[in-house]
Amino acid sequence: MLILISPAKTLDYQSPLTTTRYTLPELLDNSQQLIHEARKLTPPQISTLMRISDKLAGINAARFHDWQPDFTPENARQAILAFKGDVYTGLQAETFSEDDFDFAQQHLRMLSGLYGVLRPLDLMQPYRLEMGIRLENARGKDLYQFWGDIITNKLNEALAAQGDNVVINLASDEYFKSVKPKKLNAEIIKPVFLDEKNGKFKIISFYAKKARGLMSRFIIENRLTKPEQLTGFNSEGYFFDEASSSNGELVFKRYEQR
């Protein structure tokens, strides 16, 4: 099984590292082209394009400027330890054992606007470039056109390497849109997490994001390799609801805490 998750806007380059092992991203030639485009933008243009504050725009203009083609532990850190959003709060990779990192390296992929596809131990220099941003480039009007089939092809390589054909889609719609399902050599399983609110079950973004991380951790810790094993997920009060599930979609619910 290959697990797909989104990156995070919040980054952590300060906390102590729990592993010294690292690999290098496999699509850096493409990243270099995007950096070339991004460096043309002024901070006010970045602010408008990304809908972020002037302060954040300044930080990200500096990141684009400082980005170097040579990645080292001094200027970068492993992607799975650098991202710090809600998904990664659930994942808690900072508590992984070396064996957990090994399994994750084979079975987990992070989709990225700048790096395309990241393995957990791939070094990553800090950046902000969300997949949905309309950054014009030599290949088209946005990042979806830039990446084209490249991300899908890289995922197919990972699937072939592990010898199976199941993708667990725990990424957001914005990021999964960079994947071409018809060209993906896999059955796609999408876990959906519903929380009860005033007696009704619905997707609550913050909880759903964290649950995607919890599910990723559940798969990694238990070395799961078959999609039917996912129905045993019960972290933090979630339970599998077979009646609400359908082909390709596994629904998990959690009652409101009273």
UniProtKB/Swiss-Prot annotation:
One Gene Ontology term from the biological process aspect of the record: response to hydroperoxide
Gene Ontology CC entries for this record: cytosol
Domain of life: Bacteria
Recorded family membership: Belongs to the UPF0246 family.
Protein name: UPF0246 protein YaaA
Organism of origin: Escherichia coli O157:H7
